[in-house]
């Protein structure tokens, strides 16, 4: 077993604090509309220029192992805030740094770390309650635009495109961000359900100019297995031909004489037919087939439940108004499902979403809900260079998460104003003893720090700005972009309540752990051991 290096009490906390400050000082310069850029060197390619706090935090590894422990713990604050609300990473880092620095001073002065932690927790709980009271619902397009713009570092074009996307696909809709080919941002909305599987043979194409297959009012056959022999399909093909309708076959795979016969029939015009592979793999494929069945009011033909392909009737098939298939995607528009049946399926997936812990599964379930709800919006980012593209994409991702958070828990005055006002209101909060009172004071002072840092980054005097803001009503604040004081909501400077709440809670959580740390253990470096 490798030898270990152990540090205790003040020595341990001092090393940890040094790591915290190194990381926080690099991250906090990005806060606010006049936040500075940080340039990140990559082992390959051009350096990345960013104003995204979590991107900066992720890049930092320190040489000293004890300092690095402090930096990595602070990094957790940024990534947790990012996971919870998708934004507020820099705010969370600034709050945590203020709490840790003041907390360490109090511990060094001989105060009880556990009581300090209790005091901080008490102040944070009271602040979260006040935050919920202050929050105003965010449902109109203008508010969503403003939240998106603020989160994207005051880029109104990004705020507007996100608001348009949310308007088109609804709250449950999936909005994806991709790198575009043009210089301008573009928004495209896919109506109906789309999945990433194209036609199995180009000979199915009936729209040569567009290079796609279009089926009007088709039946939809869903099969949970590979189809290789045409005899399995003959009975249902004859029934569909008699009904003078087209047919879409979605199966695990279609090959051999089954595919050849379908192609020949399609080319001769005997029956309009197209075959595609089912989306997904394994259990995911079965779930997706069930979703398509719910959308088209059909059944999944599976031998697991005793349904055989040769015995399928027209009643087992789903149907849709239109299906478009190109080499990469299949889009089903206006499935024949009853709205109530579709809502039941969505509720079922929603239930799974609430009980899953994996982020990957959450994303997949969210996508399935969106596809059933009838829309996926794609924002294509336009930029002149690759470096600008990466930086812009990060900002759009942040803005997208922030707007979702705003719709979920409402909005409060931005620019650090909400936390400063709450700290002011809680100035008379008392703990059970003097050490707890010190913890409460530390937390309330830390809540002023985001506004102060925004002012510093804008080149203003933080104390003057903070004192001026304290004199006004609950929405009165400072617009660092223009240098003006006024009503933050009217000026369109808004923060999602969820982002502010999660930043404060995660910062307090990590600060509490660090303040109460009494020993640190790390492996001895081989060089120093030698």
From Swiss-Prot:
One Gene Ontology cellular component annotation held by this UniProt entry: GroEL-GroES complex
BP terms from Gene Ontology: chaperone cofactor-dependent protein refolding; protein refolding; response to heat
Domain of life of the organism encoding this protein: Bacteria
InterPro entries: Chaperonin_Cpn60_CS, Cpn60/GroEL, Cpn60/GroEL/TCP-1, GroEL-like_apical_dom_sf, GROEL-like_equatorial_sf, TCP-1-like_intermed_sf
Family as reported in the entry's similarity comment: Belongs to the chaperonin (HSP60) family.
A Pfam family assignment: Cpn60_TCP1
Record flagged with keyword Mitochondrion: no
Assembly and binders: Forms a cylinder of 14 subunits composed of two heptameric rings stacked back-to-back. Interacts with the co-chaperonin GroES.
Species per Swiss-Prot/TrEMBL record: Vibrio cholerae serotype O1 (strain ATCC 39315 / El Tor Inaba N16961)
Designated name of the protein: Chaperonin GroEL 2
Entry keyword Magnesium: no
EC number: 5.6.1.7
Name of the encoding gene: groEL2
Location within or outside the cell: Cytoplasm
GO molecular function: ATP binding; ATP-dependent protein folding chaperone; isomerase activity; unfolded protein binding
Subcellular location, principal: cytoplasm
Protein purpose: Together with its co-chaperonin GroES, plays an essential role in assisting protein folding. The GroEL-GroES system forms a nano-cage that allows encapsulation of the non-native substrate proteins and provides a physical environment optimized to promote and accelerate protein folding.
PROSITE patterns: CHAPERONINS_CPN60
Alphabetized UniProt keyword annotations: ATP-binding, Chaperone, Cytoplasm, Isomerase, Nucleotide-binding
Binding residue positions for ATP: 30-33, 51, 87-91, 415, 479-481, 495
Gene3D superfamilies, sorted: GroEL (3.50.7.10), GroEL-like equatorial domain (1.10.560.10), TCP-1-like chaperonin intermediate domain (3.30.260.10)
């Amino acid at each position: 077993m490798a030898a270990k290096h152990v540090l205790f009490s003040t020595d341990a906390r001092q090393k940890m604090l040094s790591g915290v400050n190194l990381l926080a000082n690099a991250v906090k310069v990005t806060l606010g509309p006049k936040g500075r850029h940080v340039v990140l060197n990559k082992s390959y390619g051009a350096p990345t220029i960013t104003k995204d706090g979590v991107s900066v935090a992720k890049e930092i590894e320190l040489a000293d192992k004890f300092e690095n422990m402090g930096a990595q713990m602070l990094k957790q604050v940024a990534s947790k805030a990012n996971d919870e609300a998708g934004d507020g990473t820099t705010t969370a880092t600034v709050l945590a740094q203020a709490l840790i620095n003041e907390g360490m001073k109090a511990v060094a002065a001989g105060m009880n770390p556990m009581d300090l932690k209790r005091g901080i927790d008490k102040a944070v709980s009271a602040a979260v309650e006040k935050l919920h009271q202050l929050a105003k619902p965010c449902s109109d397009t203008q508010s969503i635009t403003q939240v998106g713009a603020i989160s994207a570092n005051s880029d109104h074009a990004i705020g507007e495109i996100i608001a348009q996307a949310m308007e088109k696909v609804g709250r449950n809709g999936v909005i994806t961000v991709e790198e575009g080919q043009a210089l301008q941002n573009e928004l495209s909305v896919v109506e109906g359900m789309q999945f990433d599987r194209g036609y199995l043979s180009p000979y199915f194409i009936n729209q040569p100019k567009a290079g796609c297959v279009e089926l009007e009012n088709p039946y939809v056959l869903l099969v949970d297995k590979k189809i290789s022999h045409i005899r399995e399909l003959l009975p249902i093909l004859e029934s569909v031909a008699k009904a003078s309708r087209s047919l879409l076959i979605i199966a695990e795979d279609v090959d051999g004489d089954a595919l050849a016969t379908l192609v020949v029939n399609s080319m001769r015009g005997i029956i309009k037919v197209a075959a595609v592979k089912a989306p997904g793999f394994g259990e995911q494929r079965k779930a997706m087939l069930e979703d398509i069945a719910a959308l088209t009011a059909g059944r999944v033909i599976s031998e697991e439940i005793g349904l055989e392909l040769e015995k399928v009737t027209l009643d087992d098939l789903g149907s849709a108004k239109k299906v478009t298939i190109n080499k990469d995607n299949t889009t089903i528009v206006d499935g024949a499902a009853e709205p109530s049946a579709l809502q039941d399926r969505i509720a079922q997936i929603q239930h799974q979403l609430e009980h899953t812990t994996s982020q990957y599964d959450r994303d997949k379930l969210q996508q399935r809900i969106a596809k059933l709800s009838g829309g996926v919006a794609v924002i294509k980012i336009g930029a002149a260079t690759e470096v600008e593209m990466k930086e812009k994409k990060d900002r759009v991702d942040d803005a997208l998460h922030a707007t979702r958070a705003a719709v979920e828990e409402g909005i409060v005055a931005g620019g650090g104003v909400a936390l400063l006002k709450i700290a002011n209101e809680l100035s008379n909060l008392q703990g059970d003893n003097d050490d707890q009172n010190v913890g409460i004071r530390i937390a309330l002072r830390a809540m002023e720090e985001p506004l102060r840092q925004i002012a510093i980054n804008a080149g203003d005097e933080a104390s003057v700005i903070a004192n001026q803001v304290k004199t006004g009503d609950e929405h009165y604040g400072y617009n660092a972009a223009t240098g003006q004081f006024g009503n933050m909501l009217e000026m369109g400077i808004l923060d999602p309540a969820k982002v502010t709440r999660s930043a404060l809670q995660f910062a307090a959580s990590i600060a509490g752990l660090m303040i109460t740390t009494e020993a640190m253990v790390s492996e001895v470096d081989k060089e120093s051991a030698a």
